[in-house]
Design a protein with these regions (language model features):
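Structural/interface elements that position substrates and couple domains in central-metabolism enzymes
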Residues: 1-7, 31
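NAD(P)-dependent Rossmann-like dehydrogenase/reductase catalytic/cofactor-binding core
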Residues: 13-14, 19-138
Length: 138
């Protein structure tokens, strides 16, 4: 959680994104699935190898480590792809992997509908954007 917050502050303070941009991006990605699954289950559901690939390029910019975490490399080397081949951070049978895929898809549609029911207040969004611009000297 705090690593996420640190990166959010860095993006805003460095002028890469506004507070609204960061909040929207998290809400429209992280916020959709985090109440359904933790990060390891999510990678199982969405395809583990892609995360390793992105980590190779992204981690040097996020922290001092230039290494992909050993855990994900070991999982990828074992040919695990998550629910796609019923092998990932969690153990699956083919049937349980398909059930997880189906549940994830249903949840995704349900949570999107719920999120649309509670849009952010437009005045808050404009205020956040203005405050972020002032902080970065725009």
């Amino acid at each position: 959680m705090y690593a996420l917050l640190r990166e959010a502050f860095f993006l805003v303070e460095s002028g890469y994104a506004t507070i609204e941009d960061v909040d929207r991006s998290l809400r429209n990605d992280f916020g959709y699935w985090i109440t359904f699954a933790g990060p390891f289950r999510y990678m199982d559901l969405t395809g583990i190898p892609a995360y390793e690939t992105v980590m190779r390029d992204l981690l040097p910019d996020l922290c001092r480590s230039t290494e992909v975490p050993r855990l994900i490399s070991d999982v990828v080397k074992s040919d695990a792809q998550g629910v796609a081949n019923a092998r990932g951070f969690y153990k699956y049978t083919r049937a349980s992997a398909r059930r997880w895929e189906k549940r994830f898809l249903e949840f995704t549609y349900d949570i999107r509908a719920l999120a649309l029911k509670y849009p952010g207040d437009s005045r808050e969004r404009v205020g956040a954007r203005l405050r972020a611009r002032k902080r970065v000297g725009r």
